[in-house]
Amino acid sequence: MSKHRNAAVDRDRLPFVAPCRKLSLWAPFRWIRLGVADLIHAPQQSLVYGLAVAVLIGAVSLVAWFRGSQWIMFGMLGGFVFLAPLTCVGLYAISAQLERGQEPVLTRSLRAAFKRHIGNEAVFALVLLVIFLVWSRAAVIVTAVMYPTDGDPTTTELISFLAFGSGVGAIFAAVTFSASAFSLPMIMHRDVDSVTAIVTSVNAVLRNKGAMIVWLAIIIFALALGVITAFVGLIVLIPVIGYATWHGYEETIDASEFPRHSEGITATPRPSASSTMEHDPVI
């Protein structure tokens, strides 16, 4: 595919948001199954990537623990649930290679994921970074203001603290998760800007609240399981979640009206793109 194809696209005629498909409540479990299949087909690349992310999350958590408190650490771990798309971008490229019958190469995946789309990804990362920093600061403030410091806290005081902290976190979580659920896969898949990708993601989440709540619960469960296993479980769980996110994007978002990238892994369609799964009508 030449670069002239994308140059000829009249971007003023492109829709502001890509339509989405209506998902069944159990669709996220199908994404997980496909994610496990990708892990099996690319075990070495997946585990190396998962190890790197697990070490990063573990290191940040330890710093938060020793320099702050366990409550700050839990707040930062909550933030990782919604920053996960940034850490999984390279995994999307591995899934895309597998779909096209290519042997996945980790260096090529990282180059395709970051170097080719660095502009839009940098804007998206900056937005998430600001939200994450505000979230982290909010966790510190909530701990300082709400956590009882006089003697042993009562059950009522602890419940009040946890309820208030959870409410504050839920506000940040809802906004960030909606914006990040499908944004980065779309940026890597099609030649779109960050605003279009974010609005498309929010639209898809709002129109599929049930399925996305299930998906969010799966992500939180995976992170909790990773923490319980001293972050060792994340070595496997991060790749599965990353691959599942890519398949979830492909099942949910109809980005066919937007141009493909002129070069790179996703410049060409996957051979069986029209027959791999039955899609519901777009909404």
Positions of the model-derived regions?
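Hydrophobic alpha-helical membrane segments
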Residues: 1-283
